[in-house]
A protein has these predicted regions:
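Glycine-rich phosphate-binding loops of nucleotide-dependent enzymes
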Residues: 2-255
Length: 255
């Protein structure tokens, strides 16, 4: 098996399967994510994409199959163990603290990465050592001018940028982005696309995304899922010409 050697592939799944009381959500999925690439997972609603994310990040145990990260079998690990290895997921629903400032949200991400999670009672002086790094991350996602803004007041697209900043604070080697442009207007989509391109330098990104123009713009490799299994894989040019892929998307009005 290639998974035991790591090498060019940062993440590999071998025949990954998940069943819920007889319903097969994911079946026989063998995925290989090349180190340093942007890899998109696409498919109609109910194709199993989010379940695959949940399996990779250990929010669900697999019914069968194996998961390798950097050549190490992580199939039985707890979510926190896998996160410590550098597999970090940005959630589809904006996972930020709405009543804290933008800076404080990123600082919490830094605290998590240092193992001082949620010590809100620590003195401001103690926490201020994290501020410089937090500001660097905010600058990376063009949020430095919003540092002192209460998060609830941020526009939606900026909240998604903040979510990416808090994910970066966890120092991901493999960054999983779940629907990063969902619910955005055209201008915000463009901003997030450029942001993903920027933060993907020297790291690997695996993303679930419905917006096919975003997928075409960003992805090195695309895996198309349908009914829990892999239907096709390749570049955007390759998969967009695949008759099975075209058929899978016909009639899915929300795609």
């Amino acid at each position: 098996m290639g998974g035991v050697s790591g090498g060019d592939y940062i993440l590999e799944t071998h025949r990954l399967t998940k069943k819920f009381r007889g319903f097969v959500a994911v079946y026989d999925v063998s995925l290989r994510v090349r180190r340093g690439s942007i890899h998109a997972l696409i498919g109609p609603n109910g194709a199993g994409k989010t379940t695959v994310f949940n399996l990779i990040t250990k929010f669900l145990p697999p019914t069968g199959g194996k998961i390798f990260f950097n050549g190490i079998d992580i199939t039985q690990e707890k979510p926190a163990q896998t996160a410590r290895r550098g597999v970090i997921r940005s959630f589809q629903i904006s996972a930020v603290f709405p009543h804290l400032t933008v800076l404080e949200n990123v600082r919490i991400g830094l605290q998590r990465s240092l193992g001082t999670s949620f010590h809100f009672w620590k003195s401001e002086k103690t926490l201020s050592v994290l501020n410089d790094r937090a500001m660097e991350l905010l600058e990376a996602v063009d949020l430095a001018p919003f540092a002192s803004v209460t998060t609830v007041e941020l526009p939606y697209g900026r909240k998604r940028a903040l979510e990416i900043a808090t994910t970066l604070a966890m120092n991901p080697e493999l960054m999983l982005l779940d629907e990063p442009t969902q619910g955005m207007g055209h201008e915000d989509v463009g901003r997030i696309v450029e942001l993903i391109r920027k933060v993907s330098v020297n790291r690997t990104v695996l993303m679930v995304e419905h917006n096919l123009s975003v997928v075409a713009d960003l992805s090195d490799t695309i895996t198309v899922m349908q009914r829990g299994s892999i239907l096709a894989e390749g570049s955007y040019t390759e998969v967009s010409k695949n008759p099975q892929v075209l058929e899978a998307y016909v009639g899915t009005a929300d795609e």
